[in-house]
Amino acid sequence: MRRFALAFAAGLLAAPAAFAADAYSLDPGHTQVRASWNHAGYSTQSLLFRQVGGDIKIDFENPSNTSLNITIPVAGIDTGVEAFDKHLASGDFFQADEFPNATFVSTSVEKTGDATLKVTGDLTIKDTTKPVTLDVVVNNSGEHPLGQFIDYYKGEWVGVTATGVITRSDWGLGFGAPITSDEVDLFISAELKKN
């Protein structure tokens, strides 16, 4: 965190020509989108979305120029229980056969601290689009230390963690609510490589 904060501060002081919105790609092996919820007061359960991708542009000098257009495949939902995965993909929830992807498109990015951002965007699930705000922590940025051993990791990288809360019934995912909580916690962890 300290290393990023120093790098971020240095970036803010650098000449404007040195920085612009650079394109980054998500590393599918180190990017996870998790959702968790309260199961009738008895436990906390979660699911994992895999193979998240999209178009990402990051501007360290002016974070408001940063943009995200993220695609989240819902057909590959993973809870660890095959029968539940199939139920979540059904018409009671994501209706994955008709709507195979959810999307998140940023509408604003605000710097809130040395290594923190508030990202607001439009989340589309099925045929419903509503705004969502994520609190983002930039864990690190710069040359990936694994680059000295593995060619894939050579170059500039950024690591982030993001959290947020949605009300699932707002997107037509309200089956079982409120016995099973309508509020769902989102947790995103990602590594991004500069193109």
What are these regions (language model features)?
Residues 1-8:
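Bacterial N-terminal signal peptides that target proteins for export
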Residues 20-195:
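Low-complexity, acidic/polar, glycine-enriched regions of mature
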